[in-house]
C-alpha cells in the first residue's frame, strides 16, 4: 500500500499528503453533484426549447462568430490550465503562475463575451421572462457563467497563496483540484455549444 503512505515522494506532488488526497477525493464527489445539477438544467432546457411563445427565435439572435470566440477562449484556457498543472509537477513555480494567469485572462475574456451576449439578447427582446425557451437558456448559461466567474476568483486566491507559500503538497493539491473544476466547466460548455447553440442555429 505504498500509495497510501503519508508523504509518498514517488507520487505527484498533489498526492503527497493525506490531506491532499482526501481533498481530491472529496472534490470528485462534489463534481458528481455538479454533474447532477447541470444534467437537470440541460433536461429542463430541452423540455422547454420549443416553447418560444411566438417571440424571438434563437436562430434570429445567435451569432456564430461570438459563439466561436467564446468556445475558443474557454477551450484554449483548458489547454493552458493543463500546462500549469504540468509545470507544477515539474516544480516550476514561475511556470505555474504564468500559465495560470493566462488561463484566468482567457476565462475573464469568456465571461466578458457572455455578458455582452446577454445584454445584446435582452436589448433585442429576449429576456428571462420572454418565454420558457429563454428562461431555460438564461438559467443554464447563467449558471455556467457564474461557475466560471467563481473559478476565476478561486484560482486567483490560490495564486496569492502560491506567492506566499510556494509549491507545497498543500498548494499543489489546490492547483490540481481547481484544474479539475476548470476542465469540468469546459466539458459542460462543449455540451452547451452543441446542444444549445448548434441546434438553435439549425432551427432544431
UniProtKB/Swiss-Prot annotation:
The chain crosses the membrane at residues 27-47, 66-86, 95-115, 118-138, 140-160, 184-204. It is an enzyme of class 1 (oxidoreductase). PANTHER family: CYTOCHROME BO(3) UBIQUINOL OXIDASE SUBUNIT 3, CYTOCHROME C OXIDASE SUBUNIT III. The lineage of its organism: Bacteria, Bacillati, Bacillota, Bacilli, Bacillales. Catalyzes quinol oxidation with the concomitant reduction of oxygen to water. Major component for energy conversion during vegetative growth. NCBIfam families: QoxC. Its EC number is 1.10.3.-. Pfam families: COX3. It catalyses: 2 a quinol + O2 = 2 a quinone + 2 H2O. One of its GO terms (biological process) is aerobic respiration. Its main location: membrane. The keyword Transmembrane applies. This is Quinol oxidase subunit 3.
Amino acid at each position: 500500500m505504498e500509495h497510501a503512505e503519508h508523504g509518498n515522494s514517488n507520487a505527484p506532488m498533489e498526492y503527497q499528503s493525506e490531506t491532499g488526497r482526501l481533498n481530491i477525493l472529496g472534490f470528485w464527489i462534489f463534481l458528481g453533484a455538479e454533474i447532477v445539477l447541470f444534467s437537470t438544467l440541460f433536461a429542463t432546457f430541452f423540455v422547454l426549447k420549443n416553447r418560444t411563445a411566438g417571440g424571438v427565435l434563437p436562430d434570429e439572435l445567435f451569432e456564430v462568430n461570438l459563439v466561436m470566440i467564446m468556445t475558443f477562449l474557454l477551450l484554449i484556457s483548458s489547454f493552458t490550465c493543463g500546462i500549469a498543472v504540468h509545470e507544477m509537477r515539474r516544480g516550476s513555480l514561475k511556470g505555474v503562475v504564468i500559465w495560470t494567469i493566462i488561463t484566468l485572462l482567457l476565462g475573464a475574456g469568456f465571461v466578458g463575451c457572455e455578458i455582452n451576449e446577454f445584454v445584446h439578447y435582452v436589448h433585442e427582446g429576449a429576456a428571462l421572462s420572454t418565454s420558457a425557451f429563454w428562461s431555460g437558456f438564461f438559467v443554464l448559461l447563467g449558471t455556467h457563467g457564474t461557475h466560471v466567474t467563481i473559478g476565476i476568483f478561486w484560482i486567483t486566491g490560490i495564486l496569492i497563496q502560491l506567492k506566499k507559500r510556494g509549491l507545497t503538497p498543500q498548494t499543489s493539491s489546490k492547483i490540481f483540484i481547481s484544474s479539475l473544476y476548470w476542465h469540468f466547466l469546459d466539458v459542460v460548455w462543449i455540451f452547451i455549444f452543441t446542444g444549445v447553440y448548434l441546434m438553435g442555429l439549425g432551427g432544431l
